[in-house]
């Protein structure tokens, strides 16, 4: 009998077999896909940013270490704050 470490629908979460329920395994699959994906480095803009640990992201090219979200380098709240800061900077530059 051959055991698989993944399945077609659930992906890497197939290693749990029928345990824990389908919904949780699908959520786990989605999180694992996000955290193992390569992201663009904000310093050198090269797509080599990888997860080194919880909330720690390291660029393989320039060696930059960035603190981000647990599963993605930038969280939803971080994106909102970045946009707000950009708006403030733009409004100040228009006044001058």
From Swiss-Prot:
Query: What InterPro entries is this protein classified in?
Result: Ribosomal_eL37/eL43, Ribosomal_eL43, Ribosomal_protein_eL43, Ribosomal_zn-bd
Which Pfam family, an example, fits this chain? Ribosomal_L37ae
For this UniProt record, give its keywords in alphabetical order, as a comma-separated list: Metal-binding, Ribonucleoprotein, Ribosomal protein, RNA-binding, Zinc, Zinc-finger
What cofactor(s) does the depicted protein rely on? Zn(2+)
Zinc fingers (C4-type) by residue: 41-62
Identify one Gene Ontology CC term for this UniProt entry.
ribosome
Select a single GO molecular function from the record's annotations and give it. Answer: zinc ion binding
Q: Which GO terms describe its biological process?
A: translation
Please share the entry's free-text remark on the cofactor. Answer: Binds 1 zinc ion per subunit.
Family from the record:
Belongs to the eukaryotic ribosomal protein eL43 family.
Which protein is depicted? Large ribosomal subunit protein eL43
Query: What is the protein's species of origin?
Result: Methanococcus vannielii (strain ATCC 35089 / DSM 1224 / JCM 13029 / OCM 148 / SB)
């Amino acid at each position: 009998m051959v055991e698989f470490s993944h399945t077609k629908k659930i992906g890497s979460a197939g290693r749990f077999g029928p345990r824990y329920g389908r919904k949780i395994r699908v959520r786990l699959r989605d999180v694992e896909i996000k955290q193992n994906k390569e992201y663009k480095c904000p310093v050198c803009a090269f797509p080599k940013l990888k997860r080194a640990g919880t909330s720690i992201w390291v660029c393989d090219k320039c060696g930059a270490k960035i603190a981000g979200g647990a599963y993605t380098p930038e969280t939803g709240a971080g994106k909102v704050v970045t946009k707000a800061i950009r708006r403030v900077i733009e409004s100040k530059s228009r006044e001058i």
